[in-house]
Structure formats: structure tokens, C-alpha cells
Amino acid sequence: TPEAYNQAFAAFIRRTQPGGAVIACAEDAGVRALLANEDFSWIQVLTYGYSEGCAYRIQSIRWNGEGYDFSLFHTDTQKEIGSFRLSVPGRHNLLNAAGAVAVLYQMGLPAAKARASLADFSGTERRFESVCHSADTVVINDYGHHPTQLNLTLEAARELYPDHCLWAVWEPHTYSRTDAMQEAFTVALQRADRVVILPTYAARETAETDTPFQIAKNIPGARAACFDGFAEAADFVAGQAKGLNVVIVFSAGKGPQFASLLCEKLDERRQND
């Protein structure tokens, strides 16, 4: 439940030693609620984000074609820590970068170290990972299996590929998670132009539900479809992906296998065109 989820984070923060510090994202509603409703008075709670009240405030944000140039301002000293370049898209990645810089600064490490590390950072495996691309279609693997992750990744894709048709290929991860977050998944997937829902990755679960079909049905515009197998779904996407397309495969299970199959199907289509 959301309550249990929040309490798990509260318990984690309570493990901080007296006099220690927690660096928290002020742009996350869950974080804000947690800090407002729990007593962490024995530690320093330092926030980062875009807001005026943040201890570490992101400023001078500029899209650089791959990611963002930005600066970070330290409110307590009224000084700019430095300017930084991030070469991966997504405002969530920008926030993560700012949080990392804040931790280093809090530890007394020079901004130059953070600047060099961020400039070289190209992302992590299965996080907005390009699998194959051609002149018109890009296939991306992403480990997203929570509505918030889907939202942020689709937002980043829109920013990076504004002229492409955006596909969300989603492999639901466990029946229980899909049932519990049905409404949130439905809303998140609507950020895409086309939605393909793969068979649920059940993991340890056996009690099947029809929730993925209900999610597809509730996405307006008849732009979502469910499939019983990878081959059928890959054939569908390869046949429908005309013009400029970016296809993001969201999965914490067998998504990489589907992405590889789709790349093969797209290559076959190009050879036959």
C-alpha cells in the first residue's frame, strides 16, 4: 500500500545517525509529505530542486541537445557551487544529478570532481538504453515498471524526439502490482501516441487477472493493444511503425528479449521495403 511504501522510507531515514544529513528531493510529492508528517529533528534535512526554499537550488537550466546545462546554488552560503553539463535527457535525471552534486558538496569534495563525472556520464544499462536505431526508428530499453518511471521516461523521450511517434511497449511486472496501480498505469501510458501491452511477467505469482486488458480499454483513442506473445506484438509494431518513431520497451523482466526481436523485425521490414 502507499502507506507501507512511505513508512519504509521513513524507517530508512530514521537509521541516520544523530547529526547526520539527509539529502531529499523537494520536487517529489511523496518526499514533501514524508518530511511534513514525520519528525526528523535529530538530523539535518537538506532539500534540492527548483524551488525557492531548497538548500540546493537548480538554476540556469538549458537544453544542450542531449541533456542539460545547469548551475547549482547553495542557499546557506548564498554561493553558486558551479556549472555542470549532463548528457542524458529527462528532468528526473537532472534532479538526480543535482542530488549527487549536493551530496559531494556536503561531504566537502570539490565541484570540479562532480563536473567531470557528470560530463562523462552516459546513462546506465536498461535505463533509456538505445538498442537499435535507423534513420527513422529508435528502439530503447528501459527498466521502468512503476507509473512514475513510465511518466518520466516518456516525458524525456518527448523532449529528445519531438517529431517522432512515441510508442510505449509495456510488459506489466506481476499481477498484484498491475492491479494495485491500474489507474496510475493507465494515466502514465497515455503520454505515448501508441501503446502495446505484452503478457504480464508474473515472477512468483500465479493468480492471473485481466487488468492489462482493462488498462488498454481505458486508454482513449483506440491507440492501445494487448498481445498474447512477443512475436505477434513485434510483428504489429514493425508493421505499424511508419515514418519517424521511437519505441520504448518498459520491462523489469523479459523486455530486452522483445527489444532484440523487434529490432530484427524492423531490419527485415527495411530490407523488404
Report residues per predicted region.
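Surface-exposed amphipathic alpha-helices with a cationic face
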Residues: 154-161
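Short glycine-rich anion-binding loops that position phosphate/pyrophosphate groups of nucleotides
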Residues: 28-29, 145, 172-175, 200-203, ...
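Acidic, Mg2+-coordinating active-site environments of NTP-dependent enzymes
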Residues: 1-138, 216-223
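Short internal beta-strands
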Residues: 21-26, 167-171, 191-202
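C-terminal helical cap/extension that packs against the catalytic core
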Residues: 186-245
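Short, flexible loop segments at boundaries between secondary-structure elements
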Residues: 200, 265-273
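Active-site glycine- and acidic-residue-rich loops that bind
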Residues: 141-150, 172-180
